[in-house]
């Protein structure tokens, strides 16, 4: 089945979900929430040779494990060296998954975080995604050489909305290749997309070898939405991580995003989230 056919099939399935109540179907394993899905997935991995099955912390235990979901983020253009240094100290203290910073700070963060277990994440083609593939490839190679372990690239939104799926898939695949061994998260910027385009973009990320699909840059008119996270999770299944970013500022929102299928959260209010505090 070619890419266009797979896209059409998944769109039909997902749009059908909006007109029918959720029930167990042959494709229900994409939801990752109902008991049938979880049971079938565990049986599947055991039957294929797994001798142990691990699970992320349940929602009830998030107060202990939530920090491991969070990319502690400072992407504002006015961020100073002192603020970046504070970001790294906080990430090491709270054991966040990573710091997410602009490329100019990657080497500095890699030096500060050496030996802490906190990864350095950065952005490519940010925040518009409209630079050439060649420019993104150059950026990706450079930041990985400087110590980035994760690269959050922005999809070419205009090409996606123009239906140029081969171009978009190639763009993603080239950054995945250039970033190796770092993992790539593809920001599809949901605020500009229809549901059909979100499905197409998520599938293209999977086909192109990305490691995560991500909701938002945080610089668009809106950020992560629970329904988008759930949709992206259903489309990519267990194959990719899902990162929710933009507007996540309190524990309750973070909890709902994870419950919907997010395996990573991008946030600048990370400490307030893990300490259950309100941010003005």
Summary of predicted features, one role per range:
Residues 28-56, 269, 279-280:
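Extended, intrinsically disordered, low-complexity segments
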Residues 1-39:
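Protein-protein interaction and targeting regions used for scaffolding, dimerization, and localization
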Residues 2, 6, 10, 41, ...:
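Exposed alpha-helical structural elements
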Residues 245:
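Short hydrophobic "strand-cap" motifs at the C-terminus of beta-strands
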Residues 12-16, 20, 47, 58, ...:
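Generic surface-pattern signal
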Residues 97-100:
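N-terminal carbohydrate-binding/catalytic regions of secreted carbohydrate-active enzymes
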Residues 55-94, 104-242, 250-275, 280:
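Alpha/beta enzyme core
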């Amino acid at each position: 089945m070619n890419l266009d056919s797979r896209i059409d099939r998944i769109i039909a399935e997902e749009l059908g979900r909006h007109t029918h109540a959720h029930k167990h179907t042959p494709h229900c394993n994409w939801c990752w929430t109902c008991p049938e899905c979880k049971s079938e997935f565990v049986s599947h991995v055991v039957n294929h040779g797994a001798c142990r099955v691990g699970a992320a912390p349940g929602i009830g235990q998030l107060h202990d494990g939530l920090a491991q979901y969070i990319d502690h983020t400072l992407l504002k253009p006015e961020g100073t060296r002192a603020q970046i240094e504070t970001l790294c100290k906080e990430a090491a203290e709270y054991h966040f998954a990573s710091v997410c910073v602009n490329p100019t700070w990657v080497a500095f963060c890699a030096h500060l975080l050496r030996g802490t277990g906190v990864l350095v994440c950065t952005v490519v083609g940010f925040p518009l995604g409209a630079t050439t593939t060649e420019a993104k490839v150059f950026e990706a190679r450079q930041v990985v050489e400087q110590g980035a372990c994760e690269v959050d690239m922005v999809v070419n939104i205009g090409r996606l909305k123009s239906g140029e799926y081969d171009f978009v898939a190639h763009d993603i695949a080239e950054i995945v290749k250039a970033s190796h061994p770092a993992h790539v998260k593809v920001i599809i910027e949901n605020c500009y997309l229809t549901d059909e385009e979100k499905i197409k973009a998520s599938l293209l990320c999977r086909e192109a070898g990305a490691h995560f699909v991500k909701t938002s840059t945080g610089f668009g008119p809106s950020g992560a939405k629970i329904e988008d996270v759930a949709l992206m999770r259903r489309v990519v299944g267990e194959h990719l991580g899902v990162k929710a970013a933009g507007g996540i500022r309190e524990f309750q929102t973070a909890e709902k995003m994870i419950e919907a299928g997010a395996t990573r959260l991008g946030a600048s209010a990370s400490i307030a989230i893990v300490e259950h505090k309100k941010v003005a």
